[in-house]
Regions:
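Membrane topogenic/interface segments and analogous intrinsically disordered interaction regions
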Residues: 1-247
Length: 247
């Protein structure tokens, strides 16, 4: 192999110049923004359908400003486009960070990226299709003849976005636990021993992450977190078992 060929393939342990990193980051950001913009425009025709679907538990929305309905549509289209473009965005993130990784690290990072998206999508879907409708119906039941709900479309969508995003994040718990166990910073025995303390922390976290102040929404978030915590213990035991088998 001649010198030119060797120079065209830098070694993995050679540092990548800062300007090259910045150029690559700029390129990946542009690709991500283009993907989000394209997906936002593509899903815009479905915005009215989603608004009608969201309105089922409440009947009808109101808007209190001349531009509220207009901007709400664009806001919803953006978040729908962001979710639809998430695989592309995650691929761009992966393409950027994989340049400095060894082959074994690339494989692990690729798996983490895919699992992270699947868990976030599961949490977001769980919130949108189950938690939000049930929670809203429960909260509206506290109305009366002298307390009639008049729900602003922008405030309602902010509530839904908060719930969906929060549930997407908390569903990452098994992955976070597995990552800490993999690094040797956590053990399954510790997780089992500290279960009672973890339950208290989970309810505090649910209260902090839930957009609404009501206890019902907080409990709805805490229950899946408890299940995910137990799933994290199982993941931790699997990682420890594999580590022992590999010596």
């Amino acid at each position: 192999m001649d010198t030119a060929t060797k120079n065209s393939h830098p070694r993995l342990d050679e540092p990548i110049p800062l300007l090259s990193h910045l150029d690559e980051l700029k390129k990946r950001l542009i690709y991500s923004l283009i993907a989000i913009a394209v997906c936002s425009f593509a899903v815009y025709p479905a915005v009215d359908f989603v608004i009608r679907d969201l309105a089922k538990p409440v009947g009808k929305f109101i808007f209190t400003g001349p531009v509220e309905a207009f901007w709400t549509r664009f806001k919803l289209a953006f978040f729908m486009g962001l979710f639809a473009a998430m695989p592309v965005v995650l691929f761009q993130v992966w393409s950027f960070i994989q340049r400095g990784l060894m082959p074994k690290e690339k494989h692990m990072t690729r798996a983490i990226t895919v699992i992270s998206f699947v868990l976030f999508a599961a949490g977001a879907s769980f919130s949108y299709f189950l938690i939000v409708p049930v929670g809203v119906k429960f909260l509206l039941a506290y109305g009366s003849d002298v307390m009639v709900p008049m729900i602003s479309v922008s405030r309602y969508l902010s509530f839904v976005f908060g719930m969906v995003f929060s549930f997407g994040l908390v569903f990452e718990l098994p992955l976070i636990i597995g990552f800490l166990v993999k690094l040797g910073m956590l053990q399954s025995a510790t997780l089992r021993k500290q279960r009672r303390f973890a339950i208290v922390i989970i309810f505090i976290a649910a209260a902090a992450l839930t957009p609404g102040p009501d206890v019902f929404s907080q409990v709805l978030m805490a229950l899946p977190l408890l299940v995910l915590y137990e799933a994290g213990i199982i993941v931790a035991r699997m990682i420890e078992k594999r580590r022992k088998q590999n010596g």
